[in-house]
């Protein structure tokens, strides 16, 4: 009878360890294996590079989203995945590439040091490393600070009109003909055209589009600190940071003429996001948040070309081919496991993956089967049907017997708020201190101006997940002005539509 903790046969342990040694590459069948991705998938160094490059090109090729000559913005964070993505694009533009990439790239790095509690000296040290790395790529780049969100226009929260593109194959053939007529213009000429285009763009004189990031205004830095200090939980802070980052990337892409944005989310990262977003109430938007192409913004598409790579594959590639990521502290750096929903999900998935290697791939295959439901064309272009913060289609148009309505009813009862059929939207101009009642007596807490007047007016413009984020904020006065202005603009449009509603024709009447 075997007992726990005893080792009767140490040679058996050595035999098991020796099984993975001396394997032959599964592809070329000649060279010795240098790495083992999965059980039975042993690669030599050269075959692994060929496998890695082919997967990147195949991901872009089979989706046919990026057209030849199109300007693509690479969202670079300094992490392993985005660093590998930049290297893939850099090598794909070279003359020696067998299947050369034919789009015009640019790189964007956003400095989030203020949100993470870093000093300006620490941020400068990181920015100098970022500049040295990006200068070696020979690709035009932009470095901006997160404080720039306080100077964004309200139009960034408006969905742009999607561009009507011709047939992909016809566009490729036309580009190849032009390339032959011009004498096979190489990558260097494409990059030169990009530099000229960026220098002639309207925003090139702005600090936002310079290759180096200057010190942001102290007023914006203080506002950003107050904004993140108002979020009571780390979960809300991470969601808020993701939202502001998306707005800034979208604005820069539109201003500089980029129609596509590449992000570096890996298969592992998207698997974690799949579970965490369900926990955060974003289950309706999983195809947008985890799919290859996110077209919620209309005129700018978010592309995820690294979504088929696991974090293990990316780590091997960076290690073998001298891709040096830059460590930048994040909001959840050195945080406990239970500090946020996102961090807890990450720890949970990584532990499962260590014991069950098919965990990430199973989650990834599940996300691939999710599709966006077809939305009516009028809803697609109507601003009031989209979330004010994440620009996703609103998921709050549910019936009285839905789980969402039950949650709203429970919230009203717990706060001792009289429930009405028209929900919170009609309470936007009311105060909790009416009829001689105080804030505490009405169930709103100690403050009424920031919560009772502003929160209800925001609620009906947000999706369920963004409502939870706003609910965890102590005050809405610290939000950037472009968010407040767009909310006011939507309210005015809604009131105007109500005033002229009786003069409008129904869709059925218009068709007849």
Curated annotation (Swiss-Prot):
Give the UniProt subcellular location, in the record's own words: Cytoplasm
- Annotated organism of origin: Xenopus laevis (African clawed frog)
What protein does this entry describe? Cytoplasmic tRNA 2-thiolation protein 2-A
Give a short account of what the protein does.
Answer: Plays a central role in 2-thiolation of mcm(5)S(2)U at tRNA wobble positions of tRNA(Lys), tRNA(Glu) and tRNA(Gln). May act by forming a heterodimer with ctu1/atpbd3 that ligates sulfur from thiocarboxylated urm1 onto the uridine of tRNAs at wobble position.
Which GO molecular function annotation, any one, does this entry have? Answer: nucleotidyltransferase activity
Q: Which SUPFAM superfamilies does the UniProt entry name for this protein?
A: Adenine nucleotide alpha hydrolases-like (SSF52402)
Pfam (any one) = CTU2
Query: What would be one Gene Ontology cellular-component term for the protein?
Result: cytosol
Q: Which pathway does the UniProt entry assign to this protein?
A: tRNA modification; 5-methoxycarbonylmethyl-2-thiouridine-tRNA biosynthesis
Give one GO biological process term.
tRNA wobble uridine modification
- Principal localization? cytoplasm
Stretches that traverse the bilayer: none
Fetch the Gene3D superfamilies from UniProt: HUPs
């Amino acid at each position: 009878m075997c007992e726990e903790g005893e080792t009767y046969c140490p040679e058996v342990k050595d035999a098991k360890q020796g099984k993975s040694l001396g394997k032959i590459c599964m592809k070329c069948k000649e060279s010795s294996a240098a790495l083992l991705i999965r059980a039975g998938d042993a690669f030599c160094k050269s075959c692994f590079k060929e496998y890695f490059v082919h997967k990147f090109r195949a991901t872009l090729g089979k989706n046919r989203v990026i057209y030849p000559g199109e300007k693509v913005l690479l969202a670079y964070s300094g992490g392993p995945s985005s660093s590998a993505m930049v290297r893939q694009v850099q090598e794909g533009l070279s003359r020696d590439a067998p299947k050369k990439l034919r789009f015009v790239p640019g790189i964007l790095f956003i400095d989030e040091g203020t949100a993470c509690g870093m000093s300006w000296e620490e941020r400068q040290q990181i920015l100098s490393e970022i500049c040295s790395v990006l200068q070696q790529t020979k690709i035009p780049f932009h470095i901006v600070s997160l404080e720039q969100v306080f100077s964004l226009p309200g139009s960034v929260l408006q969905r742009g009109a999607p561009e009507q593109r011709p047939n992909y194959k016809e566009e490729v053939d036309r580009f190849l003909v032009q390339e032959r007529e011009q004498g096979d213009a190489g990558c260097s000429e494409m990059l030169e055209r990009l530099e000229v285009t960026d220098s002639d763009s309207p925003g090139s004189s702005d600090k936002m589009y310079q290759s180096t990031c200057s010190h942001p205004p102290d007023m914006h830095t203080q506002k950003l600190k107050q904004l993140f200090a108002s979020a009571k939980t780390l979960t809300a802070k991470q969601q808020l940071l993701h939202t502001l980052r998306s707005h800034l990337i979208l604005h820069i892409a539109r201003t500089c003429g980029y129609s596509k944005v590449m992000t570096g989310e890996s298969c592992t990262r998207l698997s974690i996001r799949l579970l965490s977003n369900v926990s955060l109430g974003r289950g309706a938007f999983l195809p947008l948040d985890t799919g290859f192409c996110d077209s919620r913004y209309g005129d700018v598409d978010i592309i995820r070309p690294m979504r088929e790579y696991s974090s293990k594959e990316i780590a091997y590639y960076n290690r073998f081919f001298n891709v040096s990521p830059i460590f930048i502290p994040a909001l959840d750096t050195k945080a406990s496991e239970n500090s946020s929903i996102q961090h807890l999900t990450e720890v949970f998935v990584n532990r499962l993956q260590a014991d069950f290697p098919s965990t990430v791939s199973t989650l990834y295959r599940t996300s691939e089967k999710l599709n966006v439901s077809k939305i009516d064309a009028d809803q697609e272009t109507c601003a009031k049907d989209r979330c004010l913060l994440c620009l996703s289609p609103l998921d709050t148009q549910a019936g009285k017997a839905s789980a969402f309505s039950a949650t709203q009813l429970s919230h009203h009862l717990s706060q001792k708020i009289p429930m009405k059929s028209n929900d919170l939207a009609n309470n936007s101009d009311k105060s909790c201190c009416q009829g001689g009642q105080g804030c505490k007596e009405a169930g709103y807490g100690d403050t009424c101006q920031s919560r009772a007047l502003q929160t209800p007016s925001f609620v009906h413009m947000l999706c369920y997940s963004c409502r939870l984020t706003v609910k965890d904020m102590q005050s809405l006065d610290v939000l950037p002005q472009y968010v407040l202005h767009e909310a006011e603009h939507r309210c005015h449009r809604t009131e105007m539509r109500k005033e002229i509603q009786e003069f409008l024709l129904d869709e059925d009447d218009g068709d007849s």
